[in-house]
């Protein structure tokens, strides 16, 4: 993997440094064994490994950016999906690629088309495409609503993948009955929920997703776990009830279809 330039890194990190992005970057780094760049939040020392923590009194390292493979294909993809030309150019490797980038044919892409492509990247297990969508999420051209939908999809996918996503894909490929798949689906999400109960205190951005999983299992202790207001609890419960009613208790062909259905109906 090739490093982004220092200038590009600082530009992206300064604009988009937040907890949600940090957790996504961290899991992307684990998932694809990318090099990662850490920065000490106290002395601003930068190191390409986490060994900096041994050299500094401040142990609170902030994961700045996963180093993404840059090429013209990624650049053109970002551009065709609606990223600004300035943002897309950050992923060109050299001047020649920048010159080859035709910014005159930038098509307006609907939210539904972007989410459809994102879903296909899940189903095809296309790692570079998924990373590209994450980068697209950082582009400032998109509406807040679409940004949140994309973020929800990616968080969902990555955590599921860390749990037992590959196992699910094996079952899915064997054409098990819908009822069997549903049992497997619940088993996966129960493991996911137990992990989220621990993670949500560290990453508050996952709270809504934790509600979703908790109420799916009718776990009333979710209220105590997250110390939330009554209004927050009621809002989430109502959304889950609506989702269960609309999808027949979420009898979906796969976890991917399930998450895509949420994003398409603007529940989050």
From Swiss-Prot:
Annotated Gene Ontology cellular component terms: host cell membrane; membrane
Domain of life according to the entry: Viruses
Keyword Nucleus appears in the UniProt entry: no
Membrane-side (Cytoplasmic) residue stretches: 1-175
Ranges that cross the membrane: 176-193
Residues carrying sugar: 227
Subcellular location(s) per record: Host membrane
Ranges in the topological domain labelled Extracellular: 194-268
Membrane topology: Single-pass membrane protein
Induction entry: Expressed in the early phase of the viral replicative cycle.
Keywords, ordered alphabetically: Early protein, Glycoprotein, Host membrane, Membrane, Transmembrane, Transmembrane helix
Family stated for the protein in its record: Belongs to the asfivirus MGF 300 family.
Function: Plays a role in virus cell tropism, and may be required for efficient virus replication in macrophages.
Protein name per its UniProtKB record: Protein MGF 300-1L
Protein source organism: African swine fever virus (strain Badajoz 1971 Vero-adapted)
């Amino acid at each position: 993997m090739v490093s982004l330039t220092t200038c590009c890194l600082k530009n992206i990190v300064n604009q988009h440094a937040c907890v949600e992005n940090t957790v996504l970057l961290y899991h992307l780094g684990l998932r694809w064994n990318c090099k990662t760049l850490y920065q000490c939040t106290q002395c601003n020392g930068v190191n390409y490994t986490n060994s900096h923590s041994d050299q500094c009194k401040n142990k609170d390292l902030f994961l700045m950016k996963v180093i993404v493979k840059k090429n013209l294909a990624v650049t053109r993809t970002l551009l065709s999906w609606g990223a600004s030309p300035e943002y897309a150019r950050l992923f060109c490797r050299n001047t020649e690629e920048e010159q080859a980038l035709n910014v005159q044919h930038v098509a307006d892409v609907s939210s539904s088309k972007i989410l459809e492509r994102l879903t296909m990247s899940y189903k095809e297990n296309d790692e570079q495409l998924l990373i590209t969508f994450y980068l697209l999420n950082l582009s400032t051209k998109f509406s807040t609503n679409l940004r949140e939908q994309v973020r929800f999809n990616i968080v969902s996918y990555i955590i599921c993948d860390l749990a037992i996503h590959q196992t699910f894909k094996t079952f899915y490929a064997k054409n098990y009955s819908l009822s069997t798949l549903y049992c497997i689906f619940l088993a996966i999400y129960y493991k996911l929920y137990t992990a989220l109960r621990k993670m949500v205190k560290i990453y508050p951005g996952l709270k809504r997703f934790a509600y979703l999983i908790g109420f799916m299992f009718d776990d009333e202790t979710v209220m105590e776990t997250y110390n939330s207001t009554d209004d927050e609890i009621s809002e989430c419960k109502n959304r889950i009830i609506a989702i269960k009613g609309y999808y027949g208790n979420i009898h979906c062909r796969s976890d991917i279809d399930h998450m895509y259905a949420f994003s398409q109906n603007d529940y989050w």
